[in-house]
């Protein structure tokens, strides 16, 4: 993917364009993708199909932009601590937005929404905790690029499925549950991967997890609606994981 997609894109980007500008464009693309997924259940079948196809294009574009900004920075000798900070800092928002986009698009039950959303932000926070401790950014078994390719395919598939059949039919229901639980299974494996490398020393990580669990409980009890829960987890990730980014890069 890097060779066939990203490198040709990098070659045509003018040198005067800042890598941070590309990073900010990517943030806008992620927000657009989230909005399309969030509104899709309220749309007519054809409109829903178009919205999810648009979300798939946005997801795939974001995957390319996420690689292109760093490649462009190295190519034009514009690498900086600010660029590294901005990239990781915005990922604290991107990660929960991508995860919740899939959940909202699939209209998963509250229990599954909480499990998949919290596991996604837990992975990134644990990854940053390991980065802060060891000074090296360790990539999980399933990379972000691979996850985004899978998400793109799922968005396209879901668009077709929801166009052909109503969401709340037995077969479609099993498709949704299967997709959501498969996502949680792979995310749980990622959590285990980082916990093992942290040697299960989770002192700085545990408060973040407990705050997420508290928000999950409020959602299950009805005190937080679906969108409110997503916003709360995004804010938690932005503050908790963002603090790790700042502390690590400021060392």
Model-derived regions, located:
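Membrane-interface helix starts
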Residues: 15-25
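Short hydrophobic alpha-helical membrane-embedded segments
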Residues: 24-27, 89-96, 202-212
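C-terminal membrane-associated helical module and adjoining short loops/tails
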Residues: 1-16, 120-251
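Juxtamembrane helix-capping/reentrant segments at transmembrane boundaries
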Residues: 11, 69, 73, 77-90, ...
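Membrane-embedded alpha-helical segments that form the functional core of polytopic membrane enzymes
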Residues: 23-82, 98-102, 110-121, 172-180
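Membrane-embedded alpha-helical segments in integral membrane proteins
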Residues: 31-40, 96-100, 156-160, 213-219
């Amino acid at each position: 993917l890097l060779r066939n997609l990203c490198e040709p894109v990098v070659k045509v980007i003018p040198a005067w364009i800042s890598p941070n500008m590309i990073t900010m464009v990517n943030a806008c693309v992620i927000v657009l993708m989230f909005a399309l997924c969030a509104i899709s259940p309220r749309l007519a079948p054809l409109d829903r199909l178009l919205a999810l196809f648009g979300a798939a294009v946005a997801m795939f574009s974001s995957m390319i932009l996420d690689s292109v900004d760093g490649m462009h920075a190295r190519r034009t000798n514009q690498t900086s601590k600010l660029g590294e900070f901005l990239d990781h800092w915005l990922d604290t928002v991107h990660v929960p937005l991508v995860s919740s986009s899939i959940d909202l698009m699939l209209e998963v039950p509250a229990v599954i929404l909480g499990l998949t959303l919290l596991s996604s932000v837990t992975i990134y926070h644990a990854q940053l905790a390991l980065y802060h401790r060891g000074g090296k950014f360790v990539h999980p078994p399933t990379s972000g690029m691979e996850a985004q390719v899978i998400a793109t395919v799922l968005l396209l598939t879901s668009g077709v499925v929801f166009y052909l059949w109503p969401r709340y039919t037995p077969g479609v229901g099993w498709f949704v549950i299967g997709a959501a639980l498969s996502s949680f299974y792979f995310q749980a494996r990622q959590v285990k991967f980082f916990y093992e490398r942290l040697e299960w020393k989770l002192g700085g990580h545990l408060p973040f997890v407990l705050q997420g669990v508290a928000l999950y409980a409020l959602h299950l009890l009805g005190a937080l609606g679906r969108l409110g829960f997503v916003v709360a987890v995004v804010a938690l990730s932005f503050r908790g994981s963002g603090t790790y980014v700042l502390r690590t890069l400021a060392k």
